[in-house]
């Protein structure tokens, strides 16, 4: 993650604009003055930088707030370079010249919001890694939109560069949680969902991508005879996935061991060199619901706020605050303040696929509230958590 260290960090008066970047305000944490957030805007991007004093190391750090980071990484690095130039006592940094892929702003990199009304026939790969298989899918299926979802930033930047070099126009890339994507996609639009060499998490099953809910959403999103394809070198993971598959209705299965695929991924080549077994589980959806409408659960796309009372923030000292329900939770981690602007750090939604967001509330001529960057993804759990948050902020 781009950052710099200094014995003391000095910031110019805000707001100020330089090189197309606007540094809007610095909001200090209410119960810890050593922590603050700096809101930055650049073109259509909006993100926070976090300034923190590290007492145990006797220095200060300025870095991007992870939950608001944007792509490409070069946008964040350039913002940090601007502020780094104001410092007289920089200890170290990793803000050297951007690589081409760190500067690439691709129209094929999309947010989750883009897919709320997406209805084109598609192929989906979850955790594409080096991208070899995903690029092959896109090249071999020019009449399908291919969607790759990944959480590893260097892998995302690498494949976006390849998309540009190869001139592909049928491939979208997302940085996010695949389980959330599946919940918001329309029904029966995918011909294939590919999960190749996922992390097994044999001691932390709750972190696995394969779960009963994952199967439910995958089969809903798959078209008739669409395939969910797991490829793994871990026999325990394979057996557990097979057990889950056998609990589903209206499917057919194919199982292969050490079958050669057209494309060999970087990890697969490593496992084969170590003479490890490779397991394939192909699950075909053989029943199509006659209801072709969009998944009607996800109808709320806007997160509105009623009248927020300032006293509820000024008097609210119960941090962190947690609300845990049967199928959702809300965690108010902290409160930041910059004059008439308050920022709530939030984590909420489903226990196994939480969303982290910052809520900005401004008390000027009119009260306004919005989530920084973009709204949460409207999963059922996120909607319930949002409604509870409204109760906290508006109660008399």
Curated annotation (Swiss-Prot):
- Binding positions (S-adenosyl-L-methionine): 125, 150, 177
Q: List, alphabetically, the PANTHER family matched.
A: 3-DEOXY-D-MANNO-OCTULOSONIC-ACID TRANSFERASE/TRNA GUANINE-N 7 - -METHYLTRANSFERASE, PENTACOTRIPEPTIDE-REPEAT REGION OF PRORP DOMAIN-CONTAINING PROTEIN
| Record-linked NCBIfam families | PRK14121.1 (NF010719), tRNA (guanosine(46)-N7)-methyltransferase TrmB (TIGR00091)
The record's section on InterPro entries has: SAM-dependent_MTases_sf, tRNA_(Gua-N-7)_MeTrfase_Trmb, tRNA_methyltr_TrmB_bact
Indicate what this protein is called per its UniProt record.
Answer: tRNA (guanine-N(7)-)-methyltransferase
User: Which Pfam families does UniProt cross-reference here?
Assistant: Methyltransf_4
Q: Which CDD domains match?
A: AdoMet_MTases
The organism sits in which domain of life?
A: Bacteria
């Amino acid at each position: 993650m781009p950052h710099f260290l200094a014995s003391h960090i000095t910031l110019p008066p805000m707001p100020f604009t330089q090189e197309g970047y606007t540094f809007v305000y610095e909001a200090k944490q209410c119960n810890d003055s050593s922590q603050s957030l700096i809101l930055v805007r650049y073109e259509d991007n909006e993100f926070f930088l976090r300034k923190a004093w590290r007492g145990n190391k006797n220095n200060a750090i300025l870095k991007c707030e992870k939950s608001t980071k944007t792509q490409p990484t070069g946008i964040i690095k350039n913002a940090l370079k601007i502020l780094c130039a104001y410092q007289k006592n920089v200890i170290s940094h990793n803000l050297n010249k951007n690589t081409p892929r760190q500067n690439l702003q691709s129209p094929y990199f999309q947010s989750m919001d883009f897919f709320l009304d997406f209805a084109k026939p598609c192929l989906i790969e979850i955790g594409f890694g080096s991208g070899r298989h995903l690029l092959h899918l896109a090249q071999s299926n020019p009449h399908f939109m291919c969607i790759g979802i990944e959480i590893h930033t260097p892998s995302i930047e690498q494949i976006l560069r390849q998309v540009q070099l190869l001139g592909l126009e049928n491939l979208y890339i997302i940085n996010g949680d695949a389980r959330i994507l599946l919940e918001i996609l329309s029904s029966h639009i995918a011909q294939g969902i590919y999960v190749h060499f996922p992390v097994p998490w044999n001691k932390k099953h709750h972190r696995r991508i394969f779960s009963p809910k994952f199967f439910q959403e995958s089969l809903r999103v798959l078209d008739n005879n669409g395939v969910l394809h797991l490829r793994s070198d871990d026999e325990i993971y394979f057996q557990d996935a097979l057990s889950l598959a056998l609990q589903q209705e209206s499917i057919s299965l194919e199982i292969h061991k050490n079958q050669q695929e057209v494309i060999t991924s970087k990890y697969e080549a490593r496992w084969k060199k170590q003479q490890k077994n490779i397991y394939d589980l192909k699950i075909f959806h053989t029943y199509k619901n006659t209801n072709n409408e969009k998944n009607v659960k996800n109808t709320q796309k806007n997160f509105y706020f009623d009248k927020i009372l300032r006293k509820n923030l000024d008097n609210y000292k119960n941090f962190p605050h947690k609300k845990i329900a049967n199928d959702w939770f809300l965690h108010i981690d902290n409160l930041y303040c910059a004059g008439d602007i308050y920022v709530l750090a939030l984590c909420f939604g489903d226990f196994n696929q939480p969303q982290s967001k910052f809520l900005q509330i401004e008390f000027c001529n009119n009260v306004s509230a919005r989530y920084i960057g973009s709204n949460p993804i409207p999963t059922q759990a996120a909607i319930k958590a949002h409604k509870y948050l409204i109760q906290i902020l508006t109660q008399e």
